[in-house]
A protein has these predicted regions:
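Active-site metal-binding loops of divalent metal-dependent hydrolases
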Residues: 26-28, 62, 150-152, 182-184, ...
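Structured beta-strand-rich core segments of catalytic domains in phosphoester-bond hydrolases
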Residues: 56, 60-144, 240-243
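Bacterial Sec-dependent N-terminal signal peptides
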Residues: 1-20
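His/acidic metal-ligating clusters that form di-metal
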Residues: 131-138, 143-148, 158-184, 191-196
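Short, solvent-exposed loop/turn elements at domain surfaces
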Residues: 30-36, 157, 211-214
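Structural recognition of the beta-strand scaffold that forms the well-ordered cores
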Residues: 22-25, 56-60, 91-93, 107-108, ...
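N-terminal, active-site-proximal structural segment of metallo-dependent hydrolase catalytic domains
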Residues: 15-86, 98-102, 165, 259
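Active site of divalent-metal-dependent phosphoester/diester hydrolases
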Residues: 38, 72-76, 89-108, 128, ...
């Protein structure tokens, strides 16, 4: 009887120690409907968030109080602040560069308070500046994870290689589990993918049957990812590429169990 009780207690404890988390990654095309020029998409993106209720979300191509946002929304708009307001989540903006009187870069939403760090990534070939934003997220009272979002260079392979090397270096000694999401602008046959794979697992590959993410009207490539830092126990419950056309990229929804 004592043996049975101990076994049941162990099983209960194991189940209790598993945490399920839902994550969204989405390139939002600077807040504009990709196939309806001049039409805003933030209400649509907020509706998507409210429907699927992710715990964490990473966004790319995010404007903050730019002239471009004013041309679409009639007022200079901080997209992450608006998404946070419309969803009840906590928002964090990571500026990669000054743009049109405001900022342009990455954004995160979380369902719990957190603190964000922003790091500018290297661009040895020049081109558009890029940033990495990440937070220390309280998964439970006793467990924390790191959640990161980025958007790598679309112009030069040398930049992407430097950027993934910098990401690997940034999290090399991080003890909590790390999840990295974003539009990485490379396909699985390229060198940056190989470099990232030395330290991370591609969630869609772990799940099986990875789906194309770009472009929405004619999907030909998979460039939007969730990566899981090696050395930690992640179970990929689901990876969905969602069928929405609010941007030129498809949103990716990931469900994980973390031990």
């Amino acid at each position: 009887m004592k043996w049975i009780f101990t076994l049941l207690l162990f099983s209960f404890t194991s189940v209790q120690s598993q945490q399920t988390i839902k994550i969204l990654s989405y390139n939002i095309f600077h807040g504009e409907q990709a196939y309806k020029k001049g039409e805003p998409n933030i209400d649509s993106v907020a509706g998507l968030i409210n429907k699927y209720k992710p715990d964490l979300a990473a966004f790319q191509e995010v404007d903050s109080a730019t002239g471009r946002s004013e041309s679409i929304y009639k007022v200079r708009t901080d997209f992450i602040a608006e998404l946070a307001r419309k969803t009840g989540m906590h928002g964090f903006f990571g500026k990669a560069m000054d743009y049109d009187g405001g900022g342009y870069g990455e954004g995160l939403l979380t369902n719990k308070p957190a603190r964000a760090t922003v790091k500018i990534l290297p661009t040895p070939k020049g081109g558009e500046p890029r940033a990495l934003i990440y937070i220390d997220y309280p998964l439970s009272k006793k467990k924390r994870i790191v959640f990161a979002g980025t958007h790598l260079c679309h112009q030069f392979e040398e930049n992407r290689i430097s950027q993934v090397n910098e990401i690997n270096k940034t999290f090399e000694k991080t003890k909590p589990p790390v999840i990295l999401c974003g539009d990485l602008n490379f396909t699985p046959d390229k060198e940056p993918y190989r470099i990232l794979s030395t330290a991370w697992n591609d969630a869609a590959i772990l799940k099986g049957d990875p789906q194309l993410t770009f472009s929405v009207d004619n999907p030909k490539v998979r460039i939007d990812y969730a990566w899981l830092k090696k050395g930690h126990t992640f179970k990929v419950v689901d990876v969905q590429v969602l069928p929405y056309d609010y941007s030129d990229h498809k949103p990716v929804l990931i469900t994980l169990e973390i031990q």
